[in-house]
Amino acid sequence: MSTNNCTFKDRCVSILCCKFCKQVLSSRGMKAVLLADTDIDLFSTDIPPTNTVDFIGRCYFTGICKCKLKDIACLKCGNIVGYHVIVPCSSCLLSCNNGHFWMFHSQAVYGINRLDATGVNLLLWGNLPETEECTDEETLEISAEEYIR
């Protein structure tokens, strides 16, 4: 995976929510662009979402690259919200990338920027613990302050 000359540590961490039912899907999302087509905005995460999405349908390939993909759907409402890169192709691995293989369509999810421990500053990816994804629904609740932002 090529992250040389690429830095993502200054990117904001987002809580990702399903646009259809408002379910929190991940607490460590990042705004990103599709490697094969940088005009396409999306969100991504590095840790598999727990108890919020599941695979749906069969694996597929796109005409843009040779990555093997599989759609993921929100467990609460059933809508397709993104896809998982099951097997990344060498072209994408050699491109400047953030190492994330869980992708969320910007038409299906929205992001809420997270605040750091002080509650004042935005939480940046470089300050995020490596294994933070939680499964406890109470900790995934979005505070009123974050909704207002």
Curated annotation (Swiss-Prot):
Location in the cell: Cytoplasm; Mitochondrion
Q: What is its main location?
A: cytoplasm
Question: Do you know which InterPro entries this protein is assigned to?
Answer: YPEH2ZP (IPR026768)
In the record, biological process GO terms are:
positive regulation of apoptotic process
In terms of domain of life, where is this protein from?
Eukaryota
* One GO term describing the cellular component: cytosol
Give the record's keywords alphabetically.
Cytoplasm, Mitochondrion
Task: Report where it is expressed, by tissue.
Answer: Expressed at high levels in stomach and also in kidney and, at low levels, in heart (at protein level). In the stomach, highly expressed in foveolar cells, parietal cells and chief cells (at protein level). In kidney, expressed in endothelial cells, mesangial and epithelial cells (parietal and visceral epithelium) around glomerulus (at protein level).
Assembly and binders: Interacts with UNG.
Q: What does this protein do?
A: May play a role in the regulation of cellular reactive oxygen species metabolism. May participate in cell growth regulation.
Task: Give the similarity note.
Answer: Belongs to the FAM72 family.
Give the protein name, as stated in the record. Answer: Protein FAM72A
